[in-house]
């Protein structure tokens, strides 16, 4: 009869072969690690999603019903509700585009401080709008209104971004940092050109241009939403389906390559999808620099995982909840609907400064 193995005082004996302290182990079962370390992290994620969904539902109901004095169910009631549904549709598109684009951009660049705006989307939008008003006067605003100009502006932004990173990343010495640096320089040059043209405008034209360049949810037209919504949904779905690839890209170029992933190709494909999202939202409502950074930072702090399958939905839900809540409070309580983007940008800018000061570096 075999004698039991001696163990050190105060220590439990080792489990028999083929077992662990948690129970028996099946040698043929594939080994895998989950997105969450503990069950508590998974429960916390469910609670976060439930809370954000509740906030989104309550704020949506408030936007639709608050201040609608028409008799419920009447034609006037549904006419008012339909107008508000269009605003909610714009908010949903903006939240989707900024959240998915910013989180994906953070992943491929390996930096959670910068935003896709660094590629010069907003500077190009401002330059095109300013040039139209500079050449055509006040009529330039009308020229930029319509489905054709909307698609043309979005396509121009996508082409510029695609040409930028495909040219820089395809070269042997190309790198993400070089691409970002060139994007900053181009954005600064376009901004300086726009400022120069704006100084030469007459006051009336400048006033019309300023109203267009100010990011505002009310700027979006119904025909724009019908085009932007399917594109945004399809691109966001593609990014979510590529979540596992984004998880691998987040490990770094060397680790991703060793795991069999073509890192540069994944980088270019992701940047193309990000460019489409940013072009859609910028052409739809105008520049909103810090919205994506705000909701992405919020998602990182709420979700205890690095898996993009879980981060991306929370970022989009947080973006929708933040925008609808701000829209409801400022438009229906303080009657200052135009200040929604101002408040969002203010909070996002403060969050950016706090994050930079805590990290101590860019």
Question: What is the predicted function of each stretch?
Answer:
Residues 2-362:
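Alpha-helical transmembrane segments in inner-membrane proteins
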């Amino acid at each position: 009869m075999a004698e039991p193995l001696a163990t050190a005082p105060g220590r439990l004996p080792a489990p028999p072969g083929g077992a662990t302290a948690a129970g028996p182990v099946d040698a043929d079962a594939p080994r895998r690690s989950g997105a969450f370390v503990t069950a508590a992290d998974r429960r916390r994620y469910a609670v976060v999603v439930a809370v954000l969904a509740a906030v989104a539902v309550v704020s949506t109901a408030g936007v639709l019903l608050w201040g609608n004095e028409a008799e419920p169910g009447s034609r006037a009631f549904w006419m008012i509700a339909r107008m508000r549904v269009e605003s909610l549709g714009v908010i949903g598109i903006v939240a989707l585009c900024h959240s998915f684009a910013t989180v994906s951009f953070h992943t491929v660049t390996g930096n959670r401080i910068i935003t896709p705006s660094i590629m010069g989307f907003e500077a190009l939008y401002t330059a095109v709008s300013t040039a139209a008003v500079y050449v055509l006067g006040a009529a330039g605003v009308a020229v930029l209104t319509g489905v054709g100009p909307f698609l043309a502006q979005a396509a121009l932004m996508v082409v510029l971004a695609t040409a930028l990173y495909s040219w820089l990343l395809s070269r042997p010495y190309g790198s993400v940092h070089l691409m970002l640096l060139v994007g900053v320089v181009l954005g600064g040059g376009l901004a300086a050109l726009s400022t120069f043209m704006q100084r030469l405008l007459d006051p009336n034209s400048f006033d019309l241009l300023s109203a267009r360049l100010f990011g505002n949810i009310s700027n979006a037209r119904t025909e724009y939403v019908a085009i932007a919504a399917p594109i945004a949904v399809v691109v966001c779905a593609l990014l979510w389906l590529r979540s596992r690839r984004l998880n691998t890209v987040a490990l770094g170029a060397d680790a991703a390559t060793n795991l069999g992933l073509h890192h540069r190709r994944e980088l270019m494909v992701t940047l193309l999808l990000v460019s489409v999202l940013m072009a859609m939202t910028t052409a739809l409502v105008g520049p909103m620099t810090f919205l994506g950074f705000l909701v992405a930072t919020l998602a990182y702090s709420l979700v205890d995982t690095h898996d993009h399958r879980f981060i991306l939905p929370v970022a989009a839900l947080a973006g929708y909840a933040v925008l609808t809540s701000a829209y409801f409070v400022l438009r229906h309580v303080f009657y200052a609907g135009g200040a929604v983007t101002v408040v969002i940008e203010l909070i996002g800018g403060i969050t950016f400064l706090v994050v930079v000061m805590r990290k101590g570096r860019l």
